Amino acid sequence: MKGILLNGYGESLDLLEYKTDLPVPKPIKSQVLIKIHSTSINPLDNVMRKGYASSIVDLKLKLPIILGRECSGEIVEIGDSVWDYEIGDQVWSASPPFSMGSHCEYITVDESEISLKPKNLTHQQSASIPFASLTAWNAIYNVLPTNKKITTNTKILVNGGNGSVGFFILQLLKKHLNVNQVSTTCNIKHFEKLKKLTLVNETIDYNNLKINDNDNNKFDLIFNCYDGGKNQNENEKKCIDALKDGGNLIGFNGPLVKFSDKDGVLSGLPMGMMNQLNSSERIKKQYSKNVHLDYAIFSPSGSTLKQISKLYENNILIPNIDKQFNLNQIKDAYTCFENSNSNGKIIINNKF
């Protein structure tokens, strides 16, 4: 099969190699083999190719590896223990970060990680959704404390609403949960698009997130989709300043991987876990403010994808695509991704 091998970690796109003679994987037990029509590039793919999470990836996989976390395609073979799907089913999937990915023509995934794709979406549209939607779903429904669940009157800010996760969160909040007051920060050029889609009540330039000292103007909950990168600490402070005392902050770039990459898995993971468990206490000491900080992560789930599929089929949610490339244009696709400033997902298509 055709596929893209990552031969080493680093900035250079020359570390990505287009191959035409890779073996087609064989599904075992509860796995299915998907003929991939379309896949995508996620922010995680872009940082993983540069070495992010390599300390953990190396425990399960050895270079070269295949990146890509989501796909849409057709089941062409099933394992002996698969009962809920059959050959010919049109499905979508998002697989764990530490497994071989979808930047190729065929992939094996467990049947628990797939569902039938939305009937009203193309494979290209469907491939833009699973990874970000499952991350966002986890943040909204599984991370918040039970006494802080979102209501229609919760005042919410999505910091980074033009990114793939942020865009999905905005849609869920306004179109599914009917939250009355939703604000977002993003690049100025995305203001009109988000307003036209009626996904926000207020748009804020992400370079100018300033809330006055009146607690009534502050937010009950902030989803911090900008919590990575070199300005992470400054960004965290802006979010905390914008929260009411007793508010909730949900990030997406927890300390587990950072500590593991820095200090190795054996010492880094325990340190990262302690740091994450003590995040709220750290904020209280550092900023003299009572804010509850949690981190949301991607978690593969076919049952959740099934729920999300219904939201698309009922026209409650819409896909968001920027540009499309063929698999052999992978270097151009990554270049576009790094320069796109989140106009939508970058899609990679296979031609059979």
Curated annotation (Swiss-Prot):
NADPH binds at residues 165, 206, 296, 298. Keywords: Mitochondrion, NADP, Nucleotide-binding, Oxidoreductase, Transit peptide, Ubiquinone biosynthesis. SUPFAM superfamilies: GroES-like (SSF50129), NAD(P)-binding Rossmann-fold domains (SSF51735). It comes from the Eukaryota. InterPro entries: ADH-like_N, GroES-like_sf, Lipid_raft_assoc_Zn_ADH, NAD(P)-bd_dom_sf, PKS_ER, RTN4I1. Its main location: mitochondrion. SMART domains: PKS_ER. One of its GO terms (molecular function) is oxidoreductase activity. It is found in: Mitochondrion matrix. This is NAD(P)H oxidoreductase RTN4IP1, mitochondrial. It comes from Dictyostelium discoideum (Social amoeba). The lineage of its organism: Eukaryota, Amoebozoa, Evosea, Eumycetozoa, Dictyostelia. The gene is rtn4ip1.
